[in-house]
Structure formats: structure tokens, C-alpha cells
UniProtKB/Swiss-Prot annotation:
Subunit structure: Component of the transcription factor SL1/TIF-IB complex, composed of TBP and at least TAF1A, TAF1B, TAF1C and TAF1D. Interacts with UBTF.
Keywords of the record: DNA-binding, Nucleus, Phosphoprotein, Transcription, Transcription regulation
Chain intervals for the UniProt region annotation (Disordered): 19-71, 88-115
InterPro entries associated with the record: TAF1D
Highest taxon, organism lineage: Eukaryota
Protein name, entry field: TATA box-binding protein-associated factor RNA polymerase I subunit D
Organism: Pongo abelii
Biased composition annotated in UniProt, kind: Basic residues: 43-53, 88-99
GO biological process: regulation of DNA-templated transcription
Residues the record lists as Phosphoserine modifications: S23, S138, S234
Length: 278
């Protein structure tokens, strides 16, 4: 009985110790769950990028593994061409069309003339027609230079427009002379001589015409003996200069003569020096 009682007591004590340990563990876990550890600013941030240095043993191991997994395939011409064709097909698939075909015909429609010609074709066409200037034919110049033809054409156009201007001027001159009743002058004078004259050259030069009424008023004044007297045609300003002005003029003449003499002396010196140098 004594042995059985001792064994039971040992079993009870062991169970109690296990329960105490379990309670301690549970209390610790509850503390971790409920309580938060305060943040300490002194902690340093860990660098997320870790430096990994490969040792020569690891390099050798990786090389051996890659050699075992990948074996080089011998390249042939057929394989190179197939690879090039596949790459070309992929490029064509990726490439997009810039425009969508409408189905209309391209280029200039038939029957229309192209306005762009070269200078050589123009010269050939012009020379095939022949020269239109008779004085060139007399000089036996069948194919004159291109620049010469252009100058002749410009001269012909200039003369034509000058002749039209002359006809227009004659027409206006006839109408204006008929209005002024000067139609007889047209038979005696040419248009070229009349061109540089005014239409009213035959009349008085001054625009204000003197009337006979002013002459009558002058005769009446002479008869009535007025205080006003008419001055005769005499030169008011005298030609004699005063004494001071004559002195100034003499001084100016002297200074001019002195300046001329100095210039002559300097020229003579310069010529003498040049002769000695030569």
C-alpha cells in the first residue's frame, strides 16, 4: 500500500508541473499578441539589397551544370536561311500598312498633257518652226542663240507698245485741239513737234489777264491830280560797294593768292623729292 501511494503522489506532482508549464507558455503567447513592442529610433534600417559575391567554387559548379544541360548545335547553311526566313515573316506580320488600298488607278490619267517640259524640247520645237525675223534670214543665221531670240522678242514687244502709246496720244491731241478751235495747226505742224508744246502756248503766259478797265482808271487819276506819283523804270540798287565791303573783298583775294602760292610750293617740293629718289 505504501508503494502504490508514493507512485500516485509522483504522478500527481508531474501532472501539476506540466499544467504550470502550459499556463506559462499560454501567458507568454497572450503577451505577444496583446502587447506591442515600442519603436526604438536607434534601430538602423536594413539594406534590402544584399551583396552576393560568387566564389570560384560556385562559378565552377554553375559552369559544369550549364555544360551538362546545354550542348552546342552545329550551324549549317540550311539552318541560317530558315532562321532568316522566319525573322522576315515576323517582321512582315508586325509591319502595318500606312494606307488602305482604294482600288483606284494610280498615276496621271490618259489623254492629259504633262505641263513640265525640258528646255531642250522647247528649243527644238522653236527651231523647227523657223525664225520669225527677216533680218536674221538676210544674215544667214538659221539657228540664232536662245538669248538672242529672247532679246529680239523683247525689242519687238517694246516697239509695239510704244507705237500704241503714240497712236493714243495723237487721238487725245486731236480731240483737245478741236475743242479749242485750233484744228488748222494740225495741217501745218507734225504731232512729234506738237508733243513737246502746251496747248495754250499761243496765248498769254500769265494766268491773270489785264483788263481795259484798269487803264481807264489810271487816266482818270492823272486828270484829277492825285498825290500818288508813278516811279519811272530805274534801277533802285546801286552798284557801288561801301568802303568796308571793299576792304573785306581785298583781304579775301590776298588770302586766296597766299593759299595758291603755298600749294604750288608744296607741289614743287614733292616733285623734287621724287626725282631724287628715282
Amino acid at each position: 500500500m505504501d508503494k502504490s501511494g508514493i507512485d500516485s503522489l509522483d504522478h500527481v506532482t508531474s501532472d501539476a508541473v506540466e499544467l504550470a508549464n502550459r499556463s506559462d507558455n499560454s501567458s507568454d503567447s497572450r503577451l505577444f499578441k496583446t502587447q506591442c513592442i515600442p519603436y526604438s529610433p536607434k534601430r538602423e534600417k536594413r539594406n534590402p539589397i544584399r551583396k552576393f559575391v560568387r566564389t570560384p567554387e560556385s562559378v565552377h559548379a554553375s559552369d559544369s551544370s550549364s555544360d551538362s544541360s546545354f550542348e552546342p548545335i552545329p550551324l549549317t547553311m540550311k539552318a541560317i536561311f530558315e532562321r532568316f526566313k522566319n525573322r522576315k515573316k515576323r517582321y512582315k506580320k508586325k509591319k502595318k500598312k500606312r494606307y488602305q488600298p482604294t482600288g483606284r488607278p494610280r498615276g496621271r490619267p490618259e489623254g492629259r498633257r504633262n505641263p513640265i517640259y525640258s528646255l531642250i524640247d522647247k528649243k527644238k520645237q522653236f527651231r523647227s518652226r523657223g525664225s520669225g525675223f527677216p533680218f536674221l534670214e538676210s544674215e544667214n543665221e538659221k539657228n540664232p542663240p536662245w538669248r538672242k531670240i529672247l532679246t529680239f522678242e523683247q525689242a519687238v514687244a517694246r516697239g509695239f507698245f510704244n507705237y500704241i502709246e503714240k497712236l493714243k496720244y495723237e487721238h487725245h491731241l486731236k480731240e483737245s485741239l478741236k475743242q479749242m478751235n485750233v484744228g488748222e495747226d494740225l495741217e501745218n505742224e507734225d504731232f512729234d513737234s506738237r508733243r513737246y508744246k502746251f496747248l495754250d502756248d499761243d496765248g498769254s503766259i500769265s494766268p491773270i489777264e489785264e483788263s481795259t478797265a484798269e487803264d481807264e482808271d489810271a487816266t482818270h487819276l492823272e486828270d484829277n491830280e492825285c498825290d500818288i506819283k508813278l516811279a519811272g523804270d530805274s534801277f533802285i540798287v546801286s552798284s557801288e560797294f561801301p568802303v568796308r565791303l571793299s576792304v573785306y573783298l581785298e583781304e579775301e583775294d590776298i588770302t586766296e593768292e597766299a593759299a595758291l602760292s603755298k600749294k604750288r610750293a608744296t607741289k614743287a617740293k614733292n616733285t623734287g623729292q621724287r626725282g631724287l629718289k628715282m
